Amino acid sequence: MHRFALVAVAILFSAVLPTTAAAAAPATADRVTARVDGHTYVLLGPSVFGVTVQQDPLAYSAVKLSDGTVRGHWSYHYYEAGVETTFSGPISCLTVHGDRAWVGGPITQSSDPAQIGSGGWWQIADNGIGPHPVIPDRTTFVGIGTLEQTQAYCDTAPEPRFIFDVQQGGVRVSAG
């Protein structure tokens, strides 16, 4: 009789454990549908905007999951006429078409407290790898406005008004 009870308990556990484990595991794992990484430096003399401006650097890394969730972080060191302003925060929007990406997120830290709570956005073009690709990677400077403008930038994926060759560093854009 004791042997029968042990067999019955073993059968019971073998039937219950797989369903318990299946219930504990997520039904589906969100897969990565897009990824961007970059660390870019750009220096422009006064002939472009009337004053020397420098992106030194714009650094970011983000992924977009199949459920639309975007995860990542960005930081930006911007110099205008030698005066540095810093911005950083999470990345909340990302759109990828081919080798181009539109990226943005809220400013949660800045050396200019008036910018905290605003949004920042930029566009990049991944033109290959290596220290000297035939066509360099390209980036815009960061635009700053409302969080609604930031999301609209990613949603509409506009052509850039100004986009510049990355002089040092690089970008990586991938879908899937």
What are these model-derived regions, one by one?
Residues 1-25:
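Secretory targeting and sorting signals
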Residues 3, 19, 27, 47, ...:
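Generic low-complexity segments that are intrinsically disordered, proline-rich and/or Lys/Arg-biased
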Residues 21-33, 63-68:
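Short, surface-exposed loop and linker segments with low hydrophobicity and enrichment for Pro/Ser/Thr
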Residues 28-50, 105:
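Tryptophan-anchored aromatic micro-motifs
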Residues 47-124:
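Predominantly extracellular/secreted and cell-surface proteins with exposed
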Residues 100-165:
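Extracytosolic low-complexity repeat regions of secreted or lipid-anchored proteins
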Residues 165-176:
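Short, low-complexity, Pro/Ser/Thr/Gly-rich segments in the mature regions of secreted, periplasmic
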